[in-house]
Amino acid sequence: MSVKIEVWGDYASFNRPEMKVERVSYDVMTPSAARGILEAIYWHPGLRWQIDRIYVRAPIRFTNIRRNEVKDKLNSRKARTVMEQGRGEMYLATSESIQQRAAMVLRDVRYVIEAHFDMTENAAEGDNPGKFQDIIKRRAEKGQFYHQPYFGTREFPVNFKLCDGMPECPKELLGERDLGWMLLDMDYSDPSDIKPVFFRAVMKDGVLDVPPMRGKGVAR
């Protein structure tokens, strides 16, 4: 069953994986980020979200900022040793490893997420699509969420509401624009070998059609 949620915010950053040092955002929201927003509003083991379309409803504008980040990572081998032996330190001293990095992020963003959900084998006997649809709409209308949804990073919170009327497409987004290869989502079908999945993103009149995970043109 289909649902449309309008989302907007001051800033967004959907980081390109090929940019290793400085953060550079994709031009528009990625399907995986859209799924994350919907799961923040309503998640249930009995349903699985599938993003169908992303409507871009604000001009694409970039700005440069500097963000504080931690340069170190927790070492999995060290963490395992601490857990097994019960001694040692397993933390990051952010005051010692903090550093500033430049980031090219989006500003003044607005999207409409069109998605549907499929029932899964984990649905309870009393679960059904109509029940889930009512819960989702009620939560969106009341602004309820399990955790604060965000645009790519928790520093950029999302405002949202149930879409009751499609905003107009900005004139500068009319026509066709090739956005290149974009992250579709992560493939968790094999927990021991999680892989990124990409698709060729083409925006037409401000609308990005999203293929299914195993659809035509999807690359692993």
Each language-model region and where it sits:
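Residue-level signal for secondary-structure boundary sites
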Residues: 13-15, 62, 121-123
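Internal, well-folded beta-alpha domain core
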Residues: 69-71, 79-220
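Glycine/small-residue-rich interface belts in oligomeric ring/scaffold proteins
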Residues: 19, 24-69
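Broad gene-expression machinery/nucleic-acid interaction feature
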Residues: 2, 51, 108-112
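Beta-strand elements of well-folded, non-transmembrane domains
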Residues: 7-11, 58, 113-121
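N-terminal, Lys/Arg- and Ser/Thr-rich interaction peptides
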Residues: 1-21, 204-206, 211
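Short linear motifs at secondary-structure transitions and domain/linker junctions
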Residues: 3, 28-32, 85-92
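A short glycine/small-residue-enriched secondary-structure motif
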Residues: 9-11, 55-56, 70-73
